[in-house]
Swiss-Prot record:
The keyword DNA damage applies. Keywords: Cytoplasm, DNA damage, DNA excision, DNA repair, Excision nuclease, SOS response. NCBIfam families: uvrC. It comes from Thermotoga sp. (strain RQ2). This is UvrABC system protein C. It is found in: Cytoplasm. One of its GO terms (molecular function) is excinuclease ABC activity. The lineage of its organism: Bacteria, Thermotogati, Thermotogota, Thermotogae, Thermotogales. The gene is uvrC. Interacts with UvrB in an incision complex. The keyword DNA repair applies. HAMAP family: UvrC. GO terms for cellular component: cytoplasm; excinuclease repair complex. One of its GO terms (biological process) is nucleotide-excision repair. Residues 194-229 form the UVR domain.
């Protein structure tokens, strides 16, 4: 420990605050304390390897005194979020979780996003993208909020969704009605769902009494569909409870999110060496998750006043319902741990089966998709520690005039690994020919990496010019099938998207006045024929700069 740091520790204040260990001006560890002097003195006699490394590496110590522990907690969270010091524990998503965002525009729009920023109101995270899509589709039919991002001041004719009855139409002056729709949506997503259910029941009963059975059936179906979408996420509780339930074991944290009696999500995170307090700071205080009124834990925390942060209660269950929720959270945690054990077992078996030197922590999978040689694309998916890492997925467009999977594989392997590091194992969807094509491509660029394939016919594992037959329930085969299915799904979805864009190009070629520049603008803005069909004349005209040509586009479509 540097002498100047020792002196600062001995002179530290008794007040609450935040301390920052730095190396060459860069924060390497940030902590908080109810009493800075007491906390910092523990660093004079390091008891763990981590603390020893911090004090040995640090050449500077900065302290910031605040009014109370709450301020210290929030400041610590904000500083860690800003600087991401290497010795602070970090929250690692084990999956991608979507959010619902209400924009901060004068007339807001609603969308599904991957990340939470400071540019609107966010709700989530949710467990499933499909669940969020289904939920928003039903809620839009009920409330009529807008989901388009168009500049409403320039629109004179409402879009397709307005004519379908799914949007109120703020673009044609229905501003107050849209404000009410957004208010209802905020209330619903905040957990206050009774208003929407009561509204649907009232409408259904009113139309039924008037013998207007067609509209009564419409509201009945909306009510049933909304209930079904919410129930698809899991258990429905008798009480209108709004809470999160947090449990953890080892480095794994699981949160059950319950809103208005509905289990709306289960999310899991890894945090190496993290405590419950660390998780609350990283997940809630830093803004990744919305703060619920109640946070159920397995036991009491320290005397920290979490109510001042927005929680009304943080602690163990107070009712049988909360006890049941805690038990459900524990079972989910056990299942997550079991799954991780099975994945690790599968990876260890894979390592033995292929006689690999290194543990296959990172596996990258490649698949080719085309239509009789046209619109050829390649997908590259990534699995780390047996789980998909979607943020590292990549797509490649391959130009060729005839179907040749081997050449396509060689092309994408050379493009990928001439610029990027090799994985521990490369997976190719296919048999011996596809595997050898990948190996040849690696040799051409002077690289070497184990390559494994999975032949489609009998789910046969292919490695080093030999076929390995495994039982259908073998953990290695199950893992490789999952990787194969994911590479195929990702490749097919990109191929479909490329094919739609090419179809759009060919249709636009027949529109007088649409040249290469306008065609490019339309494709980049709308992406598909369906999106152009549902757009207004004004929106198309704004993109290409001509109302007359925009009218021709709509006429042809």
């Amino acid at each position: 420990m540097k002498e100047k740091i020792r002196k600062k520790i001995l002179l530290a204040s008794e007040e609450p605050g935040v301390y920052i260990f730095k190396n060459k001006g860069v924060p390497i560890y940030i902590g908080k304390a109810k009493r800075l002097s007491s906390r910092l003195r523990s660093y004079l006699n390091p008891q763990t390897e981590k603390v020893f490394r911090i004090v040995e590496e640090a050449d500077e110590l900065e302290t910031i005194v605040v009014m109370n522990e709450r301020e210290a907690f929030i400041l610590e969270a904000n500083l860690i979020k800003k600087y991401r010091p290497k010795y602070n524990v970090r929250l690692k998503d084990t999956n991608f979780y979507p959010y619902i965002r209400i924009s901060d525009d004068e007339i807001p729009y609603v969308e599904i996003v991957k990340r939470k920023l400071r540019d609107g109101t966010y709700f989530g995270p949710y467990t499933s993208v499909q669940f969020v899509r289904n939920l928003l589709e039903i809620l839009q039919k009920i409330m009529g909020f807008r989901t388009c991002k168009s500049d409403l001041k320039r629109i004179k004719r409402p879009c397709f969704l307005y004519h379908l009855g799914r949007c109120i139409g703020p673009c044609i002056g229905n501003i107050e009605s849209h404000e009410e729709a957004i208010r209802k949506l905020r209330e619903f997503l905040s957990g206050n769902m009774e208003e929407v259910f009561d509204y649907l029941k009232e409408k259904m009963e009113t139309h039924s009494k008037m013998l207007d059975f067609e509209n009564a059936a419409k509201y009945r179906d909306l009510l049933l569909n909304l209930s079904n979408v919410l129930e698809s996420q899991g258990v429905v509780f008798e009480e209108n409870i709004n809470c999160d339930v947090l449990v953890h074991a080892h480095d794994l944290f699981v949160v059950l999110r319950v809103r208005n009696g509905y289990l709306v999500g289960k999310i899991s995170f890894e945090m190496e060496g993290g405590s419950v307090e660390d998780f609350i700071r990283e997940y809630y205080i830093s803004g990744r998750g919305d703060i619920p009124k109640t946070l159920i834990l397995e036991s009491d925390l320290d005397e920290m006043d979490y109510s001042s942060l927005g929680f009304e209660y943080v602690g163990p269950p107070r009712s049988t319902t909360e006890e049941d929720l805690l038990e459900k959270a524990k079972k989910n945690l056990e299942n997550e741990l079991k799954m991780r054990g099975l994945r690790k077992e599968a990876l260890e078996e894979l390592m033995k089966l292929l006689n690999m030197k290194d543990f296959p922590y990172r596996i990258e999978g490649i698949d080719i998709s085309h239509l009789q040689g046209k619109y050829t694309v390649a997908s590259l998916v990534v699995f780390e520690d047996g789980f998909p890492k979607k943020s590292d997925y990549r797509r490649y467009k391959i130009e060729q005039d005839h179907p040749d999977d081997y050449e396509s594989i060689r092309t994408v392997v050379k493009r990928r690994y001439s610029k990027h590091p090799l994985p521990n194992l490369l997976f190719v969807d296919g048999g011996i020919g596809q595997v050898n094509a990948a190996i040849e491509a690696l040799k051409e660029i002077g690289k070497d990496c184990p390559v494994v394939g999975l032949a489609k016919k009998e789910e046969t594992v292919v490695f080093e010019n030999r076929e390995i037959h495994l039982p259908h329930d073998h953990p290695v085969l199950r893992l490789l099938v999952q990787i194969r299915d994911e590479t195929h799904r990702f490749a097919v979805s990109y191929h479909r998207k490329r094919r739609e864009k090419e179809s759009l190009r060919s249709v636009l070629d027949n529109v007088p006045g649409i040249g290469p520049i306008r065609k490019k603008k339309l494709i980049e803005h709308f992406g598909s024929l369906e999106n152009i069909r549902s757009a207004s004349l004004e929106e198309i005209a704004r993109v290409i700069g001509s109302t007359e040509i925009a009218r021709r586009v709509l006429d042809i479509l």
